[in-house]
Amino acid sequence: PSYRDVIQLRAMDFTTTAVDAPALTGVRVPGEQLGGAEAFRRWVGSEVIPFLRDQYRVSEMTFVGHSFSALFGVHVLFESPSMFDHYLLASPSVWWDDQVMFRREQERYDSGQGLKAHVFMSKGELETDELSPHQDFHDQLASRNYEGLNLHWQVFPKETHLSVAPVALSHGLRTLHSTR
């Protein structure tokens, strides 16, 4: 597949709503090719996880995502938090669709639902909050005091949106799996 194909498939599976995507990656993706996160979540839950549990000895499941895939992780966290035991969300694209995930979190909170999950969120120091307000999203989650939510936050010095991924992966996995 071409670079364009990969970007389009990634955007389809990881975005939560079907709105026109800005050409941040150099590839413009029309809205009708977006918003497949819920279908992708159902497929992961009904096909991928059962396959993994059938084929391998799995005791814990950790979701790892960066950027759009971390946006998908936030969606899974709100829709079915018990799908994974741990969530590593590096630079989630919470800017998506005029910050729709802020509203989804507010709806979850207003409904009185809990949020039992172990979450590591992070961003690179050199990422601008205008593009993705990671700190604000973390602060909104942290302010709720959800029973059972174990939330970690890390800003990595001198890291950009792209360079933060490997650092967040290493640090996040150690953080999530050292608190058992």
Question: Which residues does each PLM region occupy?
Answer:
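Non-catalytic cap/lid and distal C-terminal segments of serine-dependent acyl enzymes
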Residues: P1-R180
